[in-house]
Amino acid sequence: MIRCGLACERCRWILPLLLLSAIAFDIIALAGRGWLQSSDHGQTSSLWWKCSQEGGGSGSYEEGCQSLMEYAWGRAAAAMLFCGFIILVICFILSFFALCGPQMLVFLRVIGGLLALAAVFQIISLVIYPVKYTQTFTLHANPAVTYIYNWAYGFGWAATIILIGCAFFFCCLPNYEDDLLGNAKPRYFYTSA
């Protein structure tokens, strides 16, 4: 006999692991140097620095780099991404309490709402950065050089997409409270004799 069912017990471990991976992606995005890179490798930028020397730089005034924190949009982008990261860490900690005890399932929708708020903060940051960077430094002045938003910027978007998905699941999980607690009979989508 073939039985196919839905096991909600896995959600107790999968969702915190997804949040942990989003935390790792956000750390990479916050600390990574590869937010923007020119095709001739003459410029590398991170969330914090713009380095215009051959091969880029690690980010310091001694290497001829310019701090993006001198601009209001640079501070806003960094603050929004960092606020989203802090909310994500808080939600990660709360998810253990909410998914371990039967009395704490009330917090699941709160966690989902906080994750949605963190996703909004990160989306704003990830949109402000390329728009204002392009306007401030006129990247289209030299048509021979192409600018590519690179791996660290992509990790920021990956963390944001995970946040959106986890927010949806945390908001929907209280509807399946009996399944999470193991009180419901298994529902089979298909049975064959």
Curated annotation (Swiss-Prot):
Q: Does the keyword Cytoplasm apply?
A: yes
Q: Does the keyword RNA-binding apply?
A: no
Question: What biological process terms from GO does the record include?
Answer: amelogenesis; cell-cell adhesion; desmosome organization; heterotypic cell-cell adhesion; intrinsic apoptotic signaling pathway by p53 class mediator; mammary gland duct morphogenesis; Notch signaling pathway; positive regulation of neutrophil chemotaxis
- Tissues in which the UniProt entry reports expression: Expressed in skin, heart, placental, liver, pancreas, keratinocytes and dermal fibroblasts. May translocate to the intestinal apical epithelial cell surface via sipA and sctB1/sipC-promoted exocytic translocation following infection by S. Typhimurium.
Entries under Pfam families matching the protein: PMP22_Claudin
Family annotation (InterPro entries) = P53_induced, PMP22/EMP/MP20/Claudin
Q: Which Gene3D superfamilies match?
A: 1.20.140.150
So which disease is it linked with?
Erythrokeratodermia variabilis et progressiva 7: A form of erythrokeratodermia variabilis et progressiva, a genodermatosis characterized by the coexistence of two independent skin lesions: transient erythema and hyperkeratosis that is usually localized but occasionally occurs in its generalized form. Clinical presentation varies significantly within a family and from one family to another. Palmoplantar keratoderma is present in around 50% of cases.
What is the protein's given name?
Answer: p53 apoptosis effector related to PMP-22
Q: Which organism is it from?
A: Homo sapiens (Human)
